[in-house]
Structure formats: C-alpha cells, structure tokens
C-alpha cells in the first residue's frame, strides 16, 4: 500500500481495509473525503516549525517529511487540491494516504493498511557509519561513504558535490 522502494528492510504489515491507522492519524489531512478516492485522513500529528527549518532548503525529503499543506475537495472546481496550511499545521507527509498506489475508496475512514516501518536500509548505513566511527576513533572511508549514500537520496545530482561530498568530508 506504501510507495514501492528498496529502502524498507522490515516492517509491521497491516491489512488494507481493517487495520492500521498510519495515514489516517499520521499523514496529510484530507478534507471532503466523500468525494475523494483516498478516503479520510485526520492528520492529528504535526511536525514543528523548528524541525521543518532544520532541513536544508534543497533537501528533497523536507516537504514530504514536514508537509506544510493538506488536501481538500473543492466543490466549485470538482477536484481535490493541495492547500497550504499555517505554520502550526505542518503534517507528517511521509505516511500520507495520497501516496497509495491503489486508493481504498471514499468510504474507508479509519484504516489504511500502510505498513509501519521498523528498519530501513538507510538505518543500516547510518549504524555502519556510527560503528566505524566508534571502532576506529573517528570517521573512516567506509563510514563517510555510508553517510554519503544516505545524503545522496536527499539532494538532486547537481547538488551532490556541495551538499553530499563537501558536507561529509568536512565532518
């Protein structure tokens, strides 16, 4: 039910129509769900403005992790649209029902079937870097390369020299 990627190594599975509230309580708010194929989402959890500001402005994960918008049905236009929110309503967009490949339908309101992540490949790379650092009293080439692999996912290729290589090499 979640976006297909090779990052997830282990997760807790939930059934599509009767378990898991990830994407309902955590995720973008979705208003006007009776018209929307993705169903309802309350978006009860928010990221803070300082957390949003802690991301590099070029980090492509920022506006997914800290989504300063919700989805709302526009009766006048007849479609769902992205509506920017005030600073107190920065949703956790990573677990949005809007990322689902197959929408559950407008009547599904309290379950999403979005699996809960336990360990990602990026977690393994970061643990490798930390272990290398601790075992060898400082960063090793393997530790730097592991950290660079994680950071490469965050920035466009044209920014890698500065935002990935220069950043990691300066540590």
Model-derived segments and their meaning:
Residues 157-161:
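Boundary/linker segments of alpha-helical solenoid repeat arrays
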């Amino acid at each position: 039910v979640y976006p297909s990627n090779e990052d997830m190594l282990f997760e807790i599975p939930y059934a599509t129509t009767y378990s898991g509230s990830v994407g309902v309580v955590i995720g973008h708010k979705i208003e006007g769900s009776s018209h929307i194929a993705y169903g309802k989402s309350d978006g009860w959890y928010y990221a803070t403005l300082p957390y949003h500001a802690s991301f590099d402005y070029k980090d492509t994960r920022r506006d997914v992790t800290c989504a300063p918008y919700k989805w709302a049905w526009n009766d006048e236009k007849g479609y769902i649209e992205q509506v920017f929110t005030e600073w107190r309503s920065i949703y956790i967009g990573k677990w949005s029902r809007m990322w689902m490949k197959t929408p559950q339908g407008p009547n599904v309101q309290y379950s999403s079937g979005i699996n809960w992540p336990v360990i990602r490949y990026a977690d393994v790379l970061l643990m490798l870097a930390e272990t290398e650092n601790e075992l060898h009293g400082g960063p090793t080439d393997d530790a730097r390369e592991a950290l660079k692999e994680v950071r490469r996912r965050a920035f466009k290729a044209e920014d890698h020299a500065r935002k990935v290589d220069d950043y990691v090499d300066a540590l």
